[in-house]
């Protein structure tokens, strides 16, 4: 029967190398060393050796997983992926995860709720983007939908406002219509559906101010007028008209600019 012929300490605190029949066999923790009463001269069957190795592998997997969880909450899938990257066997990984689930350190239902609540508090994602991100973290569709179902529409407003807040400062630079369109586009890109996007825009402090609208028309119109300065007059005005229309200005506002009522067009040409 195999016999322990030597036990030496590792550089890592609390770890020991076990030599059997004068050859290195495996390493164990101080806890395993004490619990198994592993001493020089101890006889071990092959079954004993395999049992010790398995216990060490399971213990190492749990320690790695606990360390990973100490930084922030994780999904079951994330923990399994992390252990896999650290070359932990599938059996040890599954055992560790099951242990952590039983201890309630891992719970995908709680993880989904916490992820959503954190997004509502400081994030900028709408339901569709949250759904996609949680699926990337390996959560089942029914778990995600159950967590999303618990959230009222009004609770998404703050996240939506964080998406579009910077556009408020574009007043006087862009037309009211263009600002609203940009806000709509950003909200949809961040996963807000039509109904939620409309709700956010209702809450957005964005009112059509005539002075700011005229200032935006002056800036955008002057920019376009200079851009097409090489074109003959009729073609130039047509291009400017198209440019301003695409940027959200009404026909009346565009005509006012082209008639020189907003700014003297000849003065623009001098710059």
From Swiss-Prot:
Gene Ontology cellular-component terms listed: cytoplasm
Lineage top rank: taxon: Bacteria
Intrachain disulfide bonds: none
Record function comment: Modulates RecA activity.
Entry keyword set: Cytoplasm
InterPro entries assigned: RecX_HTH_1st, RecX_HTH_2nd, RecX_HTH_3rd, Regulatory_RecX, WH-like_DNA-bd_sf
Keyword Cytoplasm (UniProt): yes
Main location group: cytoplasm
Gene Ontology biological-process annotations: regulation of DNA repair
Coiled coil: none
Annotated localization: Cytoplasm
Family per record: Belongs to the RecX family.
NCBIfam families: PRK14135.1 (NF010733)
Protein's name according to its UniProt entry: Regulatory protein RecX
């Amino acid at each position: 029967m195999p016999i322990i012929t030597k036990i030496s300490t590792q550089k890592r605190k609390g770890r020991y190398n076990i030599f059997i029949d004068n050859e290195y066999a495996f390493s164990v923790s101080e806890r395993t060393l004490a619990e198994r009463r592993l001493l020089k001269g101890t006889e071990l069957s092959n079954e004993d050796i395999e049992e010790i190795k398995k216990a060490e592998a399971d213990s190492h997997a749990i320690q790695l997983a606990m360390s990973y969880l100490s930084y922030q909450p994780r999904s079951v899938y994330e923990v399994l992926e992390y252990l896999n990257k650290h070359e932990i066997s599938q059996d040890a990984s599954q055992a560790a995860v099951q242990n952590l689930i039983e201890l309630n350190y891992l719970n995908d239902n709680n993880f989904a709720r916490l992820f959503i609540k954190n997004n509502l508090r400081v994030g900028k994602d709408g339901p569709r983007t949250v759904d996609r991100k949680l699926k990337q973290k390996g959560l089942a569709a029914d778990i995600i939908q159950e967590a999303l179902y618990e959230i009222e529409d009004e609770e998404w407003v703050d996240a939506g406002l964080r998406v579009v807040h910077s556009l408020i400062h574009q007043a006087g630079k862009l037309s009211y219509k263009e600002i609203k369109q940009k806000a709509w586009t950003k909200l949809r890109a961040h996963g807000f559906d039509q109904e939620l996007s409309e709700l956010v825009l209702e809450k957005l402090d964005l009112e059509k101010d005539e002075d700011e609208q005229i200032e935006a028309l002056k800036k955008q119109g002057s920019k376009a007028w200079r851009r097409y300065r090489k074109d003959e007059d009729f073609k130039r005005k047509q291009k400017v008209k198209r440019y301003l229309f695409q940027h959200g200005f009404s026909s009346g506002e565009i005509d006012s600019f082209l008639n020189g009522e907003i700014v003297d067009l000849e003065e623009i040409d001098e710059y």
